[in-house]
Structures are given as structure tokens and as C-alpha cells.
């Protein structure tokens, strides 16, 4: 993967000699096929609502403040703006998550491991909108096993509509490296939630550095911010104590907008029916023998 400066030079050459096509005349695809997708949980307000949905105590766990937390999701089920989305078989609690993602570019003089915050800032190629679709009923069951999420998340992630290169945001960073840009989500044209990207607990450069700690990030990796405050149904369910507003239904249209990037939009459709999952068999534990 070439660096940001070279990508901009190549883009300018193509633009100067190429034929233009109206955006309305093309179907956008996901802006890249990432090697991996990490999704953080970096917004304190979101954590408060989710914690309340699981208990009467809305206190953010102390562990959240100690270091960023993320999970890996599926890079092979990406959706683009305009694509249809359906809940996985057996789920009746489809939800969205309003996020922004950083995309890793060229890593000059590094294999992507143990990056400093300064190196991580330079490694960010650009930013895109990230909708982490979620089946809350499946996710809730999985999380009780103290592992996951897995099947409650891996059926679909929307990235798009494109990647805005990091240089477009450089002057917008505050003194601590945060990006105070607006982000919002609506359902069927009705505003639902909004937040500032700068309300993250850590700026993106620190998230990238943490992801590379005792590990590696590579060109094309996607790192999601986690859900913005008021950026999903489940957070509101936790605050009001019931599933109101209700889970997404076929026909609903979810639109997300981020200042400086654009918007993505997906329509919910009915899903396919699959055979029920076979539960674990209750079996007697055989006594081990030694030789």
C-alpha cells in the first residue's frame, strides 16, 4: 500500500486526465477490503447506557478507564452505502451503531508493531463512516459466556461512502489529538442521536498505538471508534428500561452522517430462515484413565 502523499499525487493525475461520471450514476462499493477490523468501545456515554441495560448500576466499569478495549469483527461481510441489510436468522433485535473508523496506510520504516503515538498518527491514511450492525438478542446470549461478541456482530458492517484522507482533518485536531467533528444518525428520516467524535476517551492515534502493542497493525487495517453517545438503540433501551424505540424492522432506513466525510444509508429487509442451532448435549463425563 502506498503512502498518503503518493496516493494524493496519483489521484490528482487520474483526475486531471480522466472522464468524470456523476455520483448518482454509480453504485458505490465498500471503500476497501481490510485485512482486519478492530472495533473499540471509546465513548463513555455509550458505555453508561449499555451497562444500565444489563444492571441497575449505570457506573462505567473501572477497567474501561485503564486502557482501550476492542474486539475483532468479520472483514468478509462488508456492506456499502445503499446495500440492503437483514438480521441474522433467529434474531428479532436488529440494531445499528454510529461510528467512525481510521484506516491504516503505509508504515514507513516499521512492521507495524509497538508504534508510538506519533508513529500511529502518521500511519493513519484516512477516515470512513462505520456502522457496526448488531443482533442484540444473539449478542446478549453470547456475552453471558464471557466471550465475544461473535455471531451477534459478524453478519454485516457498513463502511463508506469513501475514505477521506487524513490530511483533510489535520487542521481540525485539538491540542490533545481529538477530532471535534459532528456525527449523527436518523431512522426513516427522523433524527435519532448525535455526538462529537472528540467525546472519545482516547484519540485515534492512541487507539492505533494500543492495537499495535505487542502485536501489529498493517496497511488496510480498519479501527472503529466504537459507538458514539446516543448512537444505537441498545444504549437508549438501557436508559429507559425497555426496548423502546423498538428494534429495526424490514423497511426501516438508517442514515448516518459525519462532518467532513459524508453519509451512508442502508435499508433493512427480511432475512432468510435457517435450521435452528443444535444445543450442547448433556452427556456424562467419562472418567479419565492414566497409563
What are these regions (language model features)?
Residues 2-187, 191, 284-291:
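Active-site microenvironments in enzyme catalytic cores
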Amino acid at each position: 500500500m502506498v503512502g498518503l502523499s503518493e496516493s494524493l499525487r496519483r489521484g490528482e493525475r487520474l483526475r486531471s486526465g480522466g472522464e468524470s461520471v456523476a455520483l448518482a450514476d454509480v453504485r458505490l462499493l465498500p471503500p476497501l477490503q481490510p485485512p482486519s477490523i478492530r472495533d473499540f468501545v471509546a465513548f463513555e456515554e455509550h458505555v453508561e447506557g449499555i451497562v444500565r441495560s444489563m444492571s441497575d448500576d449505570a457506573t462505567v466499569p473501572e477497567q474501561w478507564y485503564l486502557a482501550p478495549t476492542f474486539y475483532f469483527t468479520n472483514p468478509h461481510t462488508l456492506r456499502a452505502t445503499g446495500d440492503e441489510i437483514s438480521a441474522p436468522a433467529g434474531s428479532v433485535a436488529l440494531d445499528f451503531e454510529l461510528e467512525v473508523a481510521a484506516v491504516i496506510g503505509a508504515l514507513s520504516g516499521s512492521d507495524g508493531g509497538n508504534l508510538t503515538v506519533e508513529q500511529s498518527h502518521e500511519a493513519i491514511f484516512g477516515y470512513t463512516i462505520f456502522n457496526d450492525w448488531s443482533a442484540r438478542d444473539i449478542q446478549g446470549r453470547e456475552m453471558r459466556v464471557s466471550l465475544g461478541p461473535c455471531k451477534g456482530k459478524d453478519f454485516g458492517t457498513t463502511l463508506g461512502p469513501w475514505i477521506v484522507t487524513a490530511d483533510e482533518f489535520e487542521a481540525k485536531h485539538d491540542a490533545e489529538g481529538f477530532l471535534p467533528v459532528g456525527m449523527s444518525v436518523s431512522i426513516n428520516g427522523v433524527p435519532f442521536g448525535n455526538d462529537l467524535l472528540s467525546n472519545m476517551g482516547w484519540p485515534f492515534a492512541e487507539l492505533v498505538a494500543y492495537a499495535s502493542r505487542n502485536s501489529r497493525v498493517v496497511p488496510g487495517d480498519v479501527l472503529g471508534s466504537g459507538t458514539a453517545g446516543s448512537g444505537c438503540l441498545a444504549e437508549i433501551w438501557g436508559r429507559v428500561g425497555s426496548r423502546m424505540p423498538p428494534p429495526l424492522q424490514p423497511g426501516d432506513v438508517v442514515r448516518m452522517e459525519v462532518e467532513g466525510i459524508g453519509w451512508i444509508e442502508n435499508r433493512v429487509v427480511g432475512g432468510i430462515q435457517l435450521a435452528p442451532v443444535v444445543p450442547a448435549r448433556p452427556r456424562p463425563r467419562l472418567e479419565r484413565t492414566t497409563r
